[in-house]
Amino acid sequence: MTVMSGENVDEASAAPGHPQDGSYPRQADHDDHECCERVVINISGLRFETQLKTLAQFPNTLLGNPKKRMRYFDPLRNEYFFDRNRPSFDAILYYYQSGGRLRRPVNVPLDMFSEEIKFYELGEEAMEKFREDEGFIKEEERPLPEKEYQRQVWLLFEYPESSGPARVIAIVSVMVILISIVIFCLETLPELKDDKDFTGTVHRIDNTTVIYNSNIFTDPFFIVETLCIIWFSFELVVRFFACPSKTDFFKNIMNFIDIVAIIPYFITLGTEIAEQEGNQKGEQATSLAILRVIRLVRVFRIFKLSRHSKGLQILGQTLKASMRELGLLIFFLFIGVILFSSAVYFAEAEEAESHFSSIPDAFWWAVVSMTTVGYGDMYPVTIGGKIVGSLCAIAGVLTIALPVPVIVSNFNYFYHRETEGEEQAQLLHVSSPNLASDSDLSRRSSSTMSKSEYMEIEEDMNNSIAHYRQVNIRTANCTTANQNCVNKSKLLTDV
């Protein structure tokens, strides 16, 4: 990029920071001259011209810092040359002209524009603001414990990919969860179900009396359930004492699910012990009803699998990011249910064989019709009712289809972010002499590797690749004579 002023001056005086006579002008004259001083930026053959004070608004960036941009100065053409993407630079230059507003051109891919932001060193603040405008969701930082022992334990139970023992613990946890869910389902089979809820006197046909008392402590299902609860409790307690923040521990929805998964067991155990000691038969029916509700909560243990399943985590993040669209969907369905249930009731009011005795009774029909399920237990029989039913089904299809693209877009975003993270993690296993020393790599590949160290290795890899590309391009562009590569030891060419 060349530096030019309004008057014709030679190249030595035109370059910033290089006065012609070797003496430096006064500060006031320098400030007045800087207001009019212009620079030329050549982006792959397309020249842009702007004032130097425009670039100086952001002195920490590549173009705003004279020392940084001087590497790309071509003294023969008196300009700064960048072999970068042309359409992207329109937005980059507007960032300086507007004082910090950054908008991606519609004809530039998202990943390419992100690379341009990094190359021109616009900063993390500009990158975060750009990602927010593009709809990216900021990842929450997950700090690690400060103490080494707590960090080791936290990585074992929270980061299954950090080491071999952590993977073993994750596999054991998944197996225990699956066993608990299988036991929860099998104990309801008629051939395996025992009348554990019955305590009393049984009169046989031969006039003999048998007192039947169920003992839950000898039940095989209860024994297996106890073993599962021991593991769940151990895992929860260890993770609680090893977590970096006790307050954030209880704010995590997954930890709340872990607590809910073990509470029913202790309530059931306490109720059984109280009944055996007190023998209060009058409260037996009430306690059994409570136990049935509490046992139902055990089914939430299946959500514990999401801690070890990337697919379930992606699904949960998608639903969380799509709460607004899901809320609109429920609101539209609510309006449709009220509208069509009222319409079908009055359309079928004069029919003796009508299935709709009231508007609330027609709510069920409207819901299954708008969701295109159609059980067939309730259906219109008149012409007017069938017309209302047809409109209800069509409206349901349109209502449900509206928010689906947004939800799918959110799912694709989280899915690609997860897959890209896995690909970057796989690249960490590729050996390179420019990344780190052997001792450093062996230390980072141990069981103490944290998420911050993963990011550090990734940054080293990107820097080494960028250095390798710059060396190759300089070699390729400066091998012949009469090239623009003047003073090769100082001038660098970017790709």
Curated annotation (Swiss-Prot):
Glycans are attached at residue 207. Changing residue 184 to C: In EA1; alters voltage dependence and kinetics of activation though not of C-type inactivation. Belongs to the potassium channel family. A (Shaker) (TC 1.A.1.2) subfamily. Kv1.1/KCNA1 sub-subfamily. Changing residue 342 to I: In EA1; phenotype without myokymia. A lipid is attached at residue 243 (S-palmitoyl cysteine). InterPro entries: BTB/POZ_dom, Ion_trans_dom, K_chnl_volt-dep_Kv, K_chnl_volt-dep_Kv1, K_chnl_volt-dep_Kv1.1, SKP1/BTB/POZ_sf, T1-type_BTB, VG_K_chnl. Residues 187-220, 275-287, 346-359, 380-386 are extracellular. The cytoplasmic N-terminus is important for tetramerization and for interaction with the beta subunits that promote rapid channel closure. The transmembrane segment S4 functions as a voltage-sensor and is characterized by a series of positively charged amino acids at every third position. Channel opening and closing is effected by a conformation change that affects the position and orientation of the voltage-sensor paddle formed by S3 and S4 within the membrane. A transmembrane electric field that is positive inside would push the positively charged S4 segment outwards, thereby opening the pore, while a field that is negative inside would pull the S4 segment inwards and close the pore. This is Potassium voltage-gated channel subfamily A member 1. One of its GO terms (biological process) is detection of mechanical stimulus involved in sensory perception of pain. Voltage-gated potassium channel that mediates transmembrane potassium transport in excitable membranes, primarily in the brain and the central nervous system, but also in the kidney. Contributes to the regulation of the membrane potential and nerve signaling, and prevents neuronal hyperexcitability. Forms tetrameric potassium-selective channels through which potassium ions pass in accordance with their electrochemical gradient. The channel alternates between opened and closed conformations in response to the voltage difference across the membrane. Changing residue 405 to L: Found in a patient with neonatal onset epileptic encephalopathy; likely pathogenic. Keywords: Cell junction, Cell membrane, Cell projection, Cytoplasmic vesicle, Disease variant, Endoplasmic reticulum, Glycoprotein, Ion channel, Ion transport, Lipoprotein, Membrane, Palmitate, Phosphoprotein, Potassium, Potassium channel, Potassium transport, Synapse, Transmembrane, Transmembrane helix, Transport, Voltage-gated channel.
